[in-house]
Amino acid sequence: MDRMSMARQGWLVPCLSHGKDDQLQGELSELSKVYREKFQTDLHTKSGDIINPGGEFLYIYLDKENYRLCRQRMVLVSNASDGLLATTLEPYSDGYTFRQVRAQLQALSGDGGRINYSKNEYSSSYFLAIQASNEFERIGVVRNTFGQSKDVWKRKMPSAGQPLDYLLIAVGCSAFLPEAALEDVELDGAI
């Protein structure tokens, strides 16, 4: 399958690990460029949203069960009581731990939705990459230990239980840091 076909069908990104997969990270960036060059004229999603071809790519974090559902059916599921949260935080970002991502997404999403970040420790283990549409509104940020932040966007959904048809650009495993990776930083008084 060539890269154009992969971009059109949702490219599977193998699990990334810090320091070892610079090539995969480069390929994800390259895929983004190819997608924009070849498909920027397709301005509507299957759900009718209008895509901004120059807009940012957004990432949705989820558990394995919901990841499989979304990947197989090319849909998005809710992770908030009245919609869907997505962020500009890339799945291989240094300086973010799984727990930080989950806790901050939970604070913004509240209880409800198919994905619950506070009840499922694996709820940020997988990602879906999508292109932002006119239906997303910026609602906040996620921050890491060092004060770096990435935007969080929300899209209302007609029903929290009903999946939303949407074009997936890439899918795969997240590679945030384990909690132990930042323990030395905390002990040194850096935070």
From Swiss-Prot:
Keywords: Crown gall tumor, Plasmid. It comes from the Bacteria. This is Uncharacterized protein 6. InterPro entries: Glycosidase. The lineage of its organism: Bacteria, Pseudomonadati, Pseudomonadota, Alphaproteobacteria, Hyphomicrobiales.
